[in-house]
From Swiss-Prot:
Function per UniProt: Does not bind lactose, and may not bind carbohydrates.
Single GO MF descriptor: carbohydrate binding
A single Gene Ontology CC term: cytoplasm
PROSITE patterns assigned to the protein according to its UniProt record, in alphabetical order: GALECTIN (PS51304)
Keyword hit for Membrane: no
A Pfam family this chain is assigned to: Gal-bind_lectin
The protein, known as: Galectin-related protein
Keyword field: Lectin
Biological source species: Gallus gallus
Lineage: Eukaryota, Metazoa, Chordata, Craniata, Vertebrata
Span of domain Galectin: 38-170
Length: 171
């Protein structure tokens, strides 16, 4: 075989793009390449069971919040469906998740065992797509599950990131 699944799905930087699955060039920085926030990138082939999105960054020194969303396209008018929106809110120490289908936001979920983000510190968020749900890991620890509210996983083809953070890696 030509390598394991992990080797084939591992993020690779080629021609300034990450694994050709997220289509936004890396901002050139001699010592530490950073991705520009707000960020919007294409997920090649959309989501499917077994696919993982990796977001690594550093929380700003005095953050209010930051968000990571997986959406069905980039449309603003009408707004694209949001399969999952993750929002870290530092004032309330909450990691909120929700979705928006056909312009209607669902029931917000906010219970977490602990708040994993620290100002001015690096973090690693992994969004693992499984058949019935997204499984969210922060710094290697499973934090919660979010059950799909959008049926066609392959339509989830865009990642958007904004707020008080610096991105260091996407894959």
């Amino acid at each position: 075989m030509a390598g394991t699944v992990a080797e084939r799905d591992a993020p690779k930087i080629e021609d300034g793009h990450l694994n050709n699955s997220l289509g936004s060039p890396v901002q050139a920085d001699v010592y530490f390449p950073r991705l520009i926030v707000p960020f919007c990138g294409h997920i090649k082939g959309g989501m499917r069971p077994g696919k993982k999105i990796l977001v690594m960054g550093i929380v700003d020194l005095n953050p209010e919040s930051f968000g990571i969303s997986l959406t069905c396209g980039e449309s603003e008018d009408p707004p694209a469906d949001v399969a999952i929106e993750l929002k870290a809110v530092f004032t309330d120490r909450q990691f909120i998740r929700n979705s928006c289908v056909a312009g209607e936001w669902g029931e917000e979920q906010s219970s977490i065992p602990y708040f994993p983000f620290i100002p001015d510190q690096p973090f690693r968020v992994e969004i693992l797509c499984e058949h019935p749900r997204f499984r969210i890991f922060v710094d290697g620890h499973q934090l919660f599950d979010f059950y799909h509210r959008i049926e066609t996983l392959s339509a989830i083809d865009t990642i958007k990131i904004n707020g008080d953070l610096q991105l260091t890696k996407l894959g």
